[in-house]
Amino acid sequence: MILNIKAPENIVLKPTITVFGVGGAGSNAVNNMIHANLQGANFVVANTDAQSLEHSLCINKIQLGVSTTRGLGAGASPEVGALAAQESENEIRSSLENSNMVFITAGMGGGTGTGSAPIIARIAKELGILTVGVVTKPFHFEGGHRMKTADKGLIELQQFVDTLIVIPNQNLFRIANEQTTFADAFKMADDVLHAGVRGVTDLMIMPGLINLDFADIKAVMSEMGKAMMGTGEDSGEDRAIKAAESAISNPLLDHSSMCGARGVLINITGGPDMTLFEVDNAANRIREEVDNIDANIIFGSTFNPELKGIIRVSVVATGIDADKVPKYKLAIDENTNTVPKETYNESMIQHTQIEEIPAFNNYSTENIEITDSSIKQNYTENEQELRLHVNAVNKPENNSQKSSFLWKIWGSLRASNNQTLERKNVIVNTLDQDNKESDIHDIPAFLRKKRD
C-alpha cells in the first residue's frame, strides 16, 4: 500500500483592507496615501473622467460608465454619476471581492463622487464587507446648490455604510493660514483618512503587546453610523497625554466630541522606549471623554521602530450622536442673580418637557405660596437640592449658582412640611409678580413665558 503524504500548504490568513477612491477628490486622496507609502492596504480608484484617471498613481483603475459618459465626466450631475457606477457594477464588484473592509472616499457635491459612492457602498455591503465612508463637504464659497447636492448624497450614502465620517472643507480654515497652499489644505483633509486607515492597518501588521484581530475592529465599526477619527503624535515630556489630546480634538470634524460614542477603537504606537505608564496615561485620557458607560472600548498597542522618541495615538469613535451638544454651565451673577446674556445663546439650551422632570412628577403645587420669607426661613446649605434634568443648567451647588426662579421653586417644595412626593402630573403655570418683573434670563428657556 502506498501512502501519499503531502505537507499542508502554508496559507497566510489576514484581513484585506481596501481604500476605494471615487471621483476627483477620492482619487487625489488615494494619491496622497500612496505618496505617504501607507502599508497594509490595497488601493482602487474609479472615475468618469478618463483624463483624471490616467494621472492616478493607483494601479487598480476603473473607468466608470464608458457608454454613459464616454470618459468625459459626470458634468456635476449625481444622477449621471449613479448611472455610470451602475453600468460598471461588475468591475466594481470584482475589485472588492476578497476584501474584509473598505474605506470609500469621495468629495460630496459633484457628480461622480456624490452619485457613484452610494452605489459602490451598496455593492460592498452586498458582499458582506465592513464599509466605512470618509467624505468631504464643499466650501461655503462653492454655493448653496452644491451644498444641497452634497447633503442629498450623504443621506443616500449613509444608508449603505457601517460608519460615516464627514469632513467639511470649510473647517480647513481652522488650521490653515495665509501661507497655506490650496493643495496643502486638501492634503490636510486627506490626512484624516490616512490616519484612520493607518490606525487600523497598524493593529493588523505591526508587532505589539496588545494585538487586536479583525473581529474586534468589526465589533466597533459595524452598523455604527456617524463617527470621528483622530490621530496625534508627540515627543518629549508628557508626550503620551499630548498625543492623546491631539487625537481627540480633530478641528476638521464637526461634532467631533466623543460624548455618547457607542464604540471606541484606540491604537497607541511607539518605539522601544514607550513605557507602560505612558500607554496607561494615553488610554485613560481618551476613556475620560466617553460618557457612555456601555461603550465598547477596544484598545491595542503596537511597536514601530521608526517612532523612536515619539508616541502616536489613533482614535476611531463610532456611533456618535451628532445632535448631542456639550453640557454648558451657566454663570450666575452674584449681585443680580441673573445669567449674563453674553454667556450663552439659545443653541446651548435644549428644551425639555416639564413632565420629564422627576422632582416635579406627580406633585401638586396648587396651594404653594412663594414668598421671599419662606425661602429664607426654609433654605439651608445642607438640604437636598432640587434636581432638574436640563442640559443647559447644572444642579445648583451654592447660593450664587441658583437663579431666582429655581431657588423659589426649591424653597416652595421645602416649605411643604417635608411631605413625601407622591406621583402626580404637574405643570407650572404661574410665577409671582416679582419674577414677572425680573430679567427674562432668570427663567430657564424650557419654562420661559412669552412677555405680553
UniProtKB/Swiss-Prot annotation:
Subcellular compartments: Cytoplasm
Main location: cytoplasm
Keyword Secreted: no
GO CC terms, sorted: cell division site; cytoplasm
Domain of life the protein comes from: Bacteria
Keyword Chloroplast: no
Pfam families per record: FtsZ_C, Tubulin
SUPFAM superfamilies, A to Z: Tubulin C-terminal domain-like (SSF55307), Tubulin nucleotide-binding domain-like (SSF52490)
Binding residues annotated for GTP, in chain numbering: 24-28, 111-113, 142, 146, 190
Keywords tagged on the record: Cell cycle, Cell division, Cytoplasm, GTP-binding, Nucleotide-binding, Septation
GO terms for biological process, alphabetical: division septum assembly; FtsZ-dependent cytokinesis; protein polymerization
Record NCBIfam families: ftsZ (TIGR00065)
Quaternary structure and interacting proteins, as annotated: Homodimer. Polymerizes to form a dynamic ring structure in a strictly GTP-dependent manner. Interacts directly with several other division proteins.
Family listed: Belongs to the FtsZ family.
This protein's name: Cell division protein FtsZ
Organism placement in taxonomy: Bacteria, Pseudomonadati, Pseudomonadota, Alphaproteobacteria, Rickettsiales
